């Protein structure tokens, strides 16, 4: 079992969350499209050669983002990452994937 985390501009969060669930992540027992979100501020500065959706080259940018977390089976990770990248507006999609411990330590 894995946890997939994506950082998404707030205005795009519902679209990305739906894509994640449609790809098969976020299944907990008899529930699907399950996720947890928190809001925060994302910061970045586009470098020369970037094609930013938001902001300008060499100018620091701040944007309100949602951290979307979902549980994901190993066989759904590739489809989930593909779905996130397809629905996400950023050129470089901020993603984290963690393997979860299967038993209590």
Name each region found by the language model.
Residues 1-105:
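Hydrophobic structural segments
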């Amino acid at each position: 079992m894995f946890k997939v985390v994506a950082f998404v501009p707030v205005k795009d969060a519902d679209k990305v969350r739906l894509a994640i669930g449609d790809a098969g992540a976020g299944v907990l027992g008899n529930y699907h499209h399950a996720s947890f979100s928190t809001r925060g501020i994302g910061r970045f500065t586009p470098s020369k050669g970037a094609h930013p959706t938001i902001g300008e080259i060499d100018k620091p940018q701040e944007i309100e983002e949602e951290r979307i977390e979902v549980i994901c089976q190993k066989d759904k990770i590739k489809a989930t990452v593909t779905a996130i990248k397809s629905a996400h507006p950023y050129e470089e999609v901020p993603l984290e994937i963690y393997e979860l411990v299967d038993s209590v330590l």
